[in-house]
């Protein structure tokens, strides 16, 4: 992963949550990024350590981030002060199909509870 981080111009992160609440991207990994890298996190909150990201961006204003997920949502932390971060809502489940499936699953669970 070190090589990927140090050579890539654009990095898009799509991983499941990290076990034990450990972050995948911490200050060590952030310091490997190219000076004008663009990083997109579309995976899970906590994959990028937000405190380390804040400390890193104070000194590295050329690196761009796009964040779709956060450790705590809705996000209201200090990262909002950076102009080199784009924030988007995590709306991956807001398609008609996925909402319909979630609603059907909720109804099934309710029926199973009532019948048990």
Where are these regions (language model features)?
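C-terminal helix-to-coil terminal segments
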Residues: 72-116
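Rossmann-like adenosine-cofactor binding region
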Residues: 1-78
């Amino acid at each position: 992963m070190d090589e990927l981080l140090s050579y890539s111009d654009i990095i898009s992160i799509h991983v499941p949550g990290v076990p034990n609440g450990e972050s995948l991207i911490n200050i060590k990994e952030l310091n490997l990024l190219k000076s004008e890298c663009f990083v997109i996190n579309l995976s899970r909150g906590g994959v990028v350590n937000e405190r380390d990201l804040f400390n890193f961006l104070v000194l590295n204003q050329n690196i761009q981030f796009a964040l779709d997920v956060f450790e705590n949502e809705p996000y209201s932390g200090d990262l909002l002060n950076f102009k080199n971060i784009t924030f988007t809502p995590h709306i991956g489940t807001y398609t008609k199909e996925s909402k319909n499936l979630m609603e059907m699953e909720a109804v099934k669970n309710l029926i199973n509870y009532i019948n048990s």
